[in-house]
């Protein structure tokens, strides 16, 4: 069964973006996943097609209206079982574990926020899961939605040519990925580590693991501490 993605946005022309190319694009052509785009503005009821209003209590910016967004969400039907994500800088950080969980399902509904934010009432009433792709603010949820979809699609069964290739990537197993090398053997005075051309697969795997541990300890001590606590736990 194809993975069904549904994206609610004020800028549907931003999709599929880069997902129309390479692995994701070919997977879409093969019918391994589909993308349904919903223009939120189509669910406004006034002649100006208004989707936002000033924040209650005052303040800068505009807020996406609960009634308009709710109608857009409900257009998929009452019994749509797919998780509903709201791209938001205040959301829980997206993790590889959550990506795997989403990829194991039938699909996902992603709401792309705009303006200052989304009326809290629709977040609660429609069970939106707020998700962040990093500690920074974007002009809208569309780039973040593309990131989420990219992470999901590439691990769908059969999308990558070698399903084992994803097992050694960063965050699989909790560690960052080890360094990579390819021919030529020597480049600008720098050699490929001899262990990688030794033919000793056990030693190669040991080296790769040690390098993954080293990089994780140096660059992401938060991840390293988590892995260590789980290992000792």
Swiss-Prot record:
Main localization of the protein described in the UniProt heading: cytoplasm
Reaction(s) catalysed by this chain's protein: guanosine(37) in tRNA + S-adenosyl-L-methionine = N(1)-methylguanosine(37) in tRNA + S-adenosyl-L-homocysteine + H(+)
Superkingdom as given in the UniProt entry: Bacteria
Subcellular location: Cytoplasm
The protein's Enzyme Commission number: 2.1.1.228
GO molecular function: tRNA (guanine(37)-N1)-methyltransferase activity
Residues annotated as binding S-adenosyl-L-methionine: 113, 133-138
GO cellular component: cytosol
Methyltransferase as UniProt keyword: yes
GO biological process, one term: tRNA N1-guanine methylation
Principal EC category: transferase
Keywords: Cytoplasm, Methyltransferase, S-adenosyl-L-methionine, Transferase, tRNA processing
HAMAP family: TrmD
Protein family per UniProt: Belongs to the RNA methyltransferase TrmD family.
Subunit annotation: Homodimer.
NCBIfam families the UniProt entry points to: PRK00026.1, trmD
Record's function text: Specifically methylates guanosine-37 in various tRNAs.
Protein name: tRNA (guanine-N(1)-)-methyltransferase
Lineage: Bacteria, Pseudomonadati, Pseudomonadota, Alphaproteobacteria, Hyphomicrobiales
């Amino acid at each position: 069964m194809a993975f069904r993605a549904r994206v609610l946005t004020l800028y549907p022309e931003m999709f599929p973006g880069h997902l129309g190319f390479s692995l994701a694009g070919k997977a879409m052509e093969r019918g391994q996943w589909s993308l349904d785009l919903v223009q939120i503005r189509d669910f406004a009821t006034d002649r100006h097609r208004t989707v936002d209003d000033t924040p209650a209590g005052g303040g800068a910016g505009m807020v996406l209206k609960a009634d308009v967004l709710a109608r857009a969400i409900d257009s998929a039907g009452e019994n749509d079982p797919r998780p509903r994500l709201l791209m938001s800088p205040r959301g829980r950080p997206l993790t590889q574990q959550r990506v795997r969980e989403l990829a194991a399902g039938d699909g996902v509904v992603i709401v792309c926020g705009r303006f200052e934010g989304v009326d809290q009432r629709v977040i609660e009433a429609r069970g939106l899961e707020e998700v962040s792709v990093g500690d920074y603010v974007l002009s809208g949820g569309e780039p973040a939605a593309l990131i989420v979809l990219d992470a999901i699609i590439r691990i769908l069964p059969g999308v990558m040519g070698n399903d084992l290739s994803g097992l050694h990537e960063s965050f699989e197993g909790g560690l960052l990925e080890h360094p990579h090398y390819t021919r030529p053997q020597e480049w600008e005075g720098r050699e490929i580590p001899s262990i990688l051309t030794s033919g000793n697969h056990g030693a190669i795997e040991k080296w790769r693991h040690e390098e993954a541990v080293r990089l994780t300890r140096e660059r992401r001590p938060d991840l390293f501490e988590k892995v260590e606590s789980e290992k000792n736990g």
